[in-house]
Amino acid sequence: IGGVPGEIYPGTWKIGIGIFTEYVAQKLGEQTGEIVLTVSDRKDEVSDPICGECWVENGLHISEKSYRWENVFCPESGWYMGDFHTHTRLSDGKETIGHASERAEESGLDFYVPTEHNLMHTGWCKTSLCVLPGIEVTTDKGHMNLFGITEMPEKILEIVKHNGEEIIDTYMDQTIAQAKQKGWIRSINHPFLTIWK
């Protein structure tokens, strides 16, 4: 999940590992941990494949062809029930995308927005739900969801890299401006939960 399917071309690649420092501090305290990364040319089965629609092509852009933006899930007007703030194993959730979809369907939801911390899903499993691409922009100053995203926010890597620094305000302002320009819906998450300011 969260990967971009396709060839891995020869060249220099960088691997970014996002660690939520607030969770590390809660779980480890002053202890240290070790991250081991093994690179191999062996092809293994993917443990949590998309098993459905791939939303991206040629990078992290969700195009008109790869996501059915014009699809009508229910032609009738009325009240619809859904979840605008969810997490899977891609960030700090505990569920696979398949299990999350099953639970949402069993709960009678009409729509579901996966909003991972500073990450976006690149596809979703087959489901009757309207699944809308989203992201939770996560900083030490607060969290903001973006709904209906068509690509990763341009400043997301800077936001992750410079979290806790003064420059973060500039990157957040730029992200809000980009969201407004692209027509993405913005929502401030848990504004009164003081652990995340």
Give the location of each predicted region.
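A metal-dependent hydrolase metal-coordination microenvironment
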Residues: 65-197
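Beta-strand-rich interaction surfaces with strong enrichment in secreted/lumenal proteins
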Residues: 2-6
